[in-house]
Amino acid sequence: MAGGREIKTKIKSVQNTRKVTRALEMVSASKIRKAQERMKTSRPYAQAMKQVIGHLAQASTDFQHPFLVEREQVKRVGYIVISSDRGLAGGLNNNLFRKMLGEVRPWQDTGAEIDVVTIGQKASAFFRRIKVNMVGSVTHLGDSPQVEQLIGVIKVMIDAFIEGKVDRVYLVYNRFVNTMTQKASFDQLLPLPAAEHKVAHHDWDYLYEPDAATVLEHVMTRYIESLVYQAVLENVASEHAARMVAMKAASDNANKMIGTLQLVYNKARQAAITQEISEIVSGAAAV
């Protein structure tokens, strides 16, 4: 059995760790509400953009935007993968990466090449480690990300799609369901799925200034940016929720460990006292 001093050192070490996990749990709990508010604030814009896209897609025009055209053969697939910058969030990132690799494998089996754009330090490190072709990356967005921080990496994938270098683009992120549940999501970004741009049947007739191609190009790009931005906000909320749950579990485990070590310490102390008494009694009997 370990000595009393060694056990007390272990107890002190676990207590210090518990202070850290409790602090991280409280910080994450305070950040979840703000993250949820940002999600709710951005949703009306995304919904309005979705409705406009639906109207424009069904409008009477000779111009068909490439974002709406499904390609017959898919030779290269692009992924925009969103992760956290920091760890200590349980299996949030690893579960997402594991499921994504499962989604990628069928494409690779057909001979399709894979390109990846990463948002977040964890995704960047993971895909560099497994040597996937990364064509863009952005990290350290903070707890209040701005759409301007994302435009560069989004443009990389949009340009690749327009130029025919990529035939399909997916958005991969953790969707925030509630504090206890975050769901790995894989949304087709380009070309826009039919359900995304279809509305109730109407013969929409628009006047375009300067022309349909210019207007659609601008609106479609803003819509894609809004989808990625919304996904980033969802992922931030998921990160804080996962970290809060993970740190609470760590704090609970620390409490159990401290209780166990305290019991071991008490037994060791009792054994030491009993031994001392026995030695004293034995010494007295010898005299």
UniProtKB/Swiss-Prot annotation:
Entry keywords, A to Z: ATP synthesis, Cell inner membrane, Cell membrane, CF(1), Hydrogen ion transport, Ion transport, Membrane, Transport
Gene3D superfamilies the record matches: 3.40.1380.10, ATP synthase, gamma subunit, helix hairpin domain
A single Gene Ontology CC term: proton-transporting ATP synthase complex
Gene designation per UniProt: atpG
Functional note: Produces ATP from ADP in the presence of a proton gradient across the membrane. The gamma chain is believed to be important in regulating ATPase activity and the flow of protons through the CF(0) complex.
InterPro entries membership: ATP_synth_F1_ATPase_gsu (IPR035968), ATP_synth_F1_gsu (IPR000131), ATP_synth_F1_gsu_CS (IPR023632)
Membrane topology note: Peripheral membrane protein
MF term (GO), any: ATP binding
PANTHER family: ATP SYNTHASE GAMMA CHAIN, ATP SYNTHASE SUBUNIT GAMMA, MITOCHONDRIAL
Similarity comment: Belongs to the ATPase gamma chain family.
Keyword Metal-binding: no
Compartment annotation: Cell inner membrane
Subunit text: F-type ATPases have 2 components, CF(1) - the catalytic core - and CF(0) - the membrane proton channel. CF(1) has five subunits: alpha(3), beta(3), gamma(1), delta(1), epsilon(1). CF(0) has three main subunits: a, b and c.
Protein name: ATP synthase gamma chain
Gene Ontology annotations of biological process type: proton motive force-driven plasma membrane ATP synthesis
